[in-house]
Design a protein with these regions (language model features):
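Hydrophobic alpha-helical bundle signature of multipass membrane enzymes
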Residues: 1-111, 117, 121, 125, ...
Length: 178
């Protein structure tokens, strides 16, 4: 990853776990929208329409998913934004590397420009919602469970209706923008 190389080149501290968590957060959002919109990749559409289309060949599991939005664009932007906050003097260069990563996939014929630009917009919103420093998973269940679950102290806890509603409301707000 270009972000790793950059951080290493300038001896900037980074945590592979943090990067992994950012990628995981981005991946969940990307999967949601890929499944929702099922947009074919440019080379797939060209093939179906019997059009000549020049694209780079890549055999990868990520290429077996729909095009929209671009996971690489979203994840690299999340990483760039996160480390850009930690190292403001390097933010512009990190963003530039993230854009190269994402837009390079457009140039390769694997994505449409809107796959990239939408992913950047999603990442810019998502970075303010992601807190990788402490996850609810990392907190002992007894600490958070009563606020989140009914029957929290049993083997069969149920998420509280108020929590489900809050999550559904957040998803609706997020989807209006994308």
């Amino acid at each position: 990853n270009a972000e790793f190389s950059y951080l290493m080149k300038y001896n900037l501290e980074y945590d592979k776990k943090d990067i992994s968590e950012l990628k995981k957060a981005g991946s969940g959002v990307v999967r949601h929208y890929k499944n929702k919109f099922q947009r074919p990749r440019p080379y797939e559409l060209a093939k179906e329409m019997n059009m000549d289309f020049d694209s780079m060949e890549l055999i990868s599991d990520s290429m077996k998913t729909p095009a929209y939005p671009s996971g690489h664009s979203l994840q690299s932007r999340l990483i760039a934004e996160y480390y850009g906050k930690l190292y403001p003097k390097h933010k512009e260069n990190l963003i530039e590397l993230a854009d190269e990563c994402g837009y390079g996939r457009v140039v390769a014929g694997w994505h449409y420009p809107s796959d990239h630009t939408t992913s950047v917009k999603i990442a810019d919103k998502l970075i303010n919602m992601v807190d990788i420093q402490e996850s609810i998973i990392d907190i002992p269940r007894k600490t958070y469970a009563p606020a989140v679950f009914d029957n929290a102290d049993t083997n069969n806890p149920k998420i509280k209706a108020s929590v489900v509603k809050q999550i559904q409301d957040q998803i609706k707000v997020f989807e209006k923008e994308f």
